[in-house]
């Protein structure tokens, strides 16, 4: 049975894991790293994902997309999107349906598509390790993601060629990895501060039962915001000194961003770091190059980002209140996400909860490990684990006067189903529009509109007479479907919520086809590169053999080999893999005659003819050996 993989699709880095026996295991990518940068770069000839994309970001800033998770399921007019527009070097545009998309090299891509490219890399990483095709996955999302963002993540999986068996909340996944082997009853808080999002989740763990009591967070608070504080500080200081605004130069901005991230990481283990960026700009008056050499202390960094850390504590208060527990009731605080390595973050969390956080999990890998455990549960490989998660935000509809009427409150255990009867607002009203919202504000317009649909052909009747039953259904992924039924006529209408905007089935199918076509093109390009490498290697070895042994064969053989070499050299200048393979075949056959002549000459020098020596068996020089399979590299 094919493995179900667990993927942590992160804002800054992504990670893939599987169940290896009874324990989850992170899989290294083709570069040998356990996490992959969530970055996609587009060059003239190819698409790069992960570390190769990150390496070329400085020289190709407009065509390198990072932190796209912050855009997933969002609209162009959103305040957060407008803020990001000013900070990133790539273009954020209207996807045509009001959704925020990115534009690279004249092509528009949805955040789901960009995420799919990263998921494909994770899929390929798992396939290379397992030696078999992977088609199913569990993917994690921030606990505070709304329905539109969850749906968009599921779409990304589909575009990448994966059946997403479950969307699981990141803090819940981390709790699974933390509590898999723990038998005692505990109440834990998972504080998850990642690259782009923040979540706090309160759970009860009791011998394999993981019950989420409450969750809260901020989907626009993370390491990217910390980096931008440093970038703005560096740019301001440079402007004061040289009168040049580096934020207007996309290449300089990308260099600043990389320097800021590096400085932030270094200041987690040292008190001071130096930011050194030579030739970052030019003096407009003198034409002389300008260099940035600046010291940044941990104290200065903490003053720049102190309010961001404090901002994460408000959701912690709300989560404790919703769970009905006090700080003293929390037995363990688990830190998740790369930003929790920052000493000031650890200090503030310790001060808030009144206890030292648990240090036994790797904050970069624990979410992927939890996703793999959930994959194991769904596959039947992991027994005695029951996960009860919650919906992060209240769900309801707009009623008379624009009021938001809740049907399902936040932190309700999922899956769940809830119905309520409504009526018409006017006499003889023959249709109603059901507008579905998600959020905590009292007026519908202040919440997130998830979608709308009409229930028509209601028989004429006085206002308040018709009975319209509205039913909300939330599945285990946290994805919502809504139905409305006229109890008088039995007529009903239902939808699985698609964000106002979002990707239609046709959009997704087109993107799946594009992804498959690109995969085929990538495969052909790789085949061409490998064939060229093979040809170059053959040319080199043949040339060396002629230099060393050309005098041992007749001139006509050397001439035939040199002709074949010339033909292969010409073929290598083309982009035709078939032509190159033909050249390799011809040169291989020609070079074989050289090999035969060399062996004959060496045998003659040794005083024996080939006939005297007798025909050699292919197996003459092969030594039989017994190998013991130690099981270390067995693939399941």
Swiss-Prot record:
Keyword Nucleotide-binding among record annotations: yes
Induction: By stress conditions e.g. heat shock.
One matching Pfam family: HSP70
GO molecular function, one term: unfolded protein binding
Keywords, in A-Z order: ATP-binding, Chaperone, Nucleotide-binding, Phosphoprotein, Stress response
Ranges where the record places region Disordered: 602-636
Superkingdom in the source lineage: Bacteria
Record's compositionally biased regions (Acidic residues): 620-630
Modified residues (Phosphothreonine): 197
InterPro entries given in the database record: ATPase_NBD, Chaperone_DnaK, Heat_shock_70_CS, HSP70_C_sf, HSP70_peptide-bd_sf, Hsp_70_fam
Family label: Belongs to the heat shock protein 70 family.
Function summary: Acts as a chaperone.
Protein name: Chaperone protein DnaK
